[in-house]
Amino acid sequence: MRPLSLLGVTALLSAPALALRVAANQMWLEHTPVAYAIKNFYKGDTATLVSGGVASLSDKTVDLGANAETQGLKNYVRNKNYRLIGIIVEVTYRLVANKAAGINTLADLKGKRIGTMTGTSAEVFINQLLSSAGLSKGQYTIVNGAVCMKAPCGSGTFPQQLKSRSIDAYGVWETAVELGVEALGENNVVIFKNASIYREVYSLYSTDEKLKDAATRKKIVQFVRALNQTYDLFKNQPDKVYSTVGQLIGVDVPVLQKVWDDHKWGPGSLGSDLVDYLEYEEKYLSKADGRQAFTRAELTKFVDPTVYQDAMKPS
């Protein structure tokens, strides 16, 4: 197995000249197929995982970035050369609420304090979910906090805020929500989720320039093939990866197993249905960011299925 190289962004320039450089936030579950593919399946020269995400593509030494679709769209505003080339995982986000706060339905969240990470996919999730119940911004209060991925969770983290009743509910990525369930007990919480209203589309990104460079594109295609092998394990033989994934992000395996099924591992669809979904989310993002929404033509250009198509051809 290939050794996995984990470096900070500041170390990018010292990486080998031929290394494929992939940027992702290494704290979250969503990135783990990237790390696993590098260590176990990538057949290119070398690959290096560095801290970052889609925004790291502004550094020309970075070939690929991994992030939620929310950050992809936000970065596309000023970087029309960015391309979404693959889906790593689609995640059904959950909102956990304290029943003792009088919450049994989404409508009961009116006037409540809801924890989330502003400016992220989690905030989009909260807005879309509550909008489906007829609640608009101003009818509830958003509270920032810290994400805890492994118990015990300290002061200021969402699970602790929920337990102390400084917030009534929160929604963010896993395993943080599951820890909120455990903090209060399953019988004392209510869970809300709806993938048809919001799901995180954690994706792989590159730039138009990288994809037009034959040597770089070849490495990227090889990496997508490695990801496809990883997805197969994550979907069909998760028992083989639970321990490794838990170690990568510092979470307990029993908690990880409870949230695994809310993660639909790639490759996902890069067709018109994805563009439909991005167009739907873009209506909210453009209004929230005070800018003009992307046209459907611009969103269609943003999604580039050709790398995945190349990866599916015999090597």
Could you tell me what each predicted segment is?
Residues 1-19:
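Fungal secretory targeting signals
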Residues 20-158, 168-174, 189-198:
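Short, glycine-/small- and polar/acidic-enriched structural segments
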Residues 39-41, 60, 165, 283, ...:
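Short glycine-centered helix-capping/turn motifs at secondary-structure transition points
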Residues 69-70, 145-248:
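Pocket-lining segment of extracytoplasmic ligand-binding domains
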Residues 76, 131, 182, 247, ...:
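Short polybasic/polar patches that bind polyanions
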Residues 213-293:
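Secondary-structure end/capping motifs
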Residues 285-315:
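Conserved C-terminal helix/tail region of periplasmic/extracytoplasmic solute-binding proteins
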